[in-house]
C-alpha cells in the first residue's frame, strides 16, 4: 500500500475525515456541506430537488427525522406529476436551512456506556435516534430515518416499529 504524504495527517487533535469534522469528543457535520444547502435558492425544477435531497442525504446522520421532514420534497418527484414547489416544501426547506445554520454535533459514545434508543413511526416515514446521557443531559449519537414506500406503507404499526428496529440495527 502506498500513502500520499500530501493527503496524510498524523497526531492531530481534530480534522476532516470522510466528510465529517472529527474531534476527540464529538463528530460535527462538515461545514462545507451545510453551507452548500444554506447557499441554495428554492428549487425551481425536479433536478434541483434531487440535488437538495442528495445533499440532505449526506447529512442525514446529523438530522433528526430527516426523511419525515423531507416528505414534501419527495412529493414533488412523483412521476406523471407537474413540478410544483408548494408552501409546505418552502417551509420544510427553510426549516432545514435554519437548523443547518448551527452545524449539528453528535456525541461520541464511551465504551460500555448505556445508550438510549428512541423510535418514531409515522404513516409515511420512520425514524430513530440513539442518544447518550451525560450528567442528566441527553446528547445525540446518531440519527436514522427513512421514507416508507410501496408495500411498506401498508405495514401495521407494530410491523413499522419492528422495521425501524431492524433498520437501526444495521
Describe the residue ranges of each PLM region.
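C-terminal reverse transcriptase regions that engage the nucleic-acid substrate
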Residues: 1, 6-113
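Two-metal-ion RNase H-like nuclease active-site motif
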Residues: 113-121, 165
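Feature representing long, continuous alpha-helical segments
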Residues: 94, 126, 162-166
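A short, polar/acidic, helix/strand-boundary loop motif
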Residues: 136-163, 167
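Conserved catalytic motifs of the protein kinase core domain
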Residues: 17, 114, 125, 139-140
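Acidic, metal-ligating active-site segments
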Residues: 122-132
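Short, flexible loop/turn elements at secondary-structure junctions
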Residues: 44, 100, 121-123, 147
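Secondary-structure transition/capping motifs at alpha-helix termini
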Residues: 1-2, 132-139
Amino acid at each position: 500500500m502506498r500513502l500520499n504524504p500530501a493527503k496524510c495527517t498524523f497526531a492531530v487533535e481534530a480534522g476532516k475525515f470522510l466528510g465529517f469534522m472529527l474531534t476527540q469528543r464529538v463528530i460535527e457535520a462538515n461545514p462545507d456541506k451545510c453551507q452548500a444547502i444554506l447557499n441554495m435558492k428554492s428549487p425551481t425544477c425536479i433536478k434541483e430537488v434531487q440535488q437538495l435531497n442528495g445533499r440532505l442525504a449526506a447529512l442525514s446522520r446529523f438530522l433528526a427525522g430527516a426523511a419525515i421532514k423531507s416528505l414534501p420534497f419527495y412529493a414533488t418527484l412523483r412521476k406523471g406529476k407537474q413540478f410544483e414547489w408548494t408552501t409546505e416544501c418552502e417551509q420544510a426547506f427553510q426549516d432545514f436551512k435554519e437548523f443547518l445554520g448551527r452545524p449539528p454535533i453528535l456525541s461520541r459514545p464511551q465504551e460500555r456506556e448505556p445508550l438510549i434508543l428512541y423510535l418514531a413511526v409515522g404513516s409515511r416515514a420512520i425514524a430513530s435516534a440513539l442518544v447518550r446521557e451525560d450528567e442528566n443531559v441527553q446528547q445525540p449519537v446518531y440519527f436514522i430515518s427513512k421514507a416508507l414506500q410501496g408495500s411498506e406503507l401498508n405495514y401495521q404499526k407494530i410491523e413499522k416499529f419492528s422495521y425501524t428496529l431492524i433498520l437501526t440495527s444495521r
